[in-house]
Amino acid sequence: EKGFGFISTENGQDVFAHFSAIQTNGFKTLEEGQKVEFDVEEGQR
């Protein structure tokens, strides 16, 4: 809905995620509880 949210790492840290970073075909969306693989990168704030 908002185009951004947070992903929780295995150790419980929350990481900001913007929809533009989602690499998939079709509609870029994630569901609560969905398992994903990701790399943490520093970006502009």
Curated annotation (Swiss-Prot):
Q: Which domain of life is it from?
A: Bacteria
Give the UniProt subcellular location, in the record's own words: Cytoplasm
Q: Which Gene3D superfamilies match?
A: Nucleic acid-binding proteins (2.40.50.140)
The record's principal subcellular location, in a coarse class, is: cytoplasm
GO CC, alphabetical: cytoplasm
Q: Give GO MF terms, alphabetically.
A: DNA binding
Q: Which Pfam families match?
A: CSD
Question: Where does the CSD domain lie?
Answer: 1-45
- What conditions trigger expression of this protein? In response to low temperature.
Keywords assigned:
Activator, Cytoplasm, DNA-binding, Stress response, Transcription, Transcription regulation
The UniProt entry, under InterPro entries, shows:
Cold_shock_CspA, CSD, CSD_CS, CSP_DNA-bd, NA-bd_OB-fold
**Subunit composition?**
Homodimer.
Q: Which PANTHER family match?
A: COLD SHOCK DOMAIN PROTEIN 2, COLD SHOCK DOMAIN-CONTAINING PROTEIN 4
Q: What is the protein name given in its UniProt record?
A: Major cold shock protein
The lineage is:
Bacteria, Bacillati, Bacillota, Bacilli, Lactobacillales
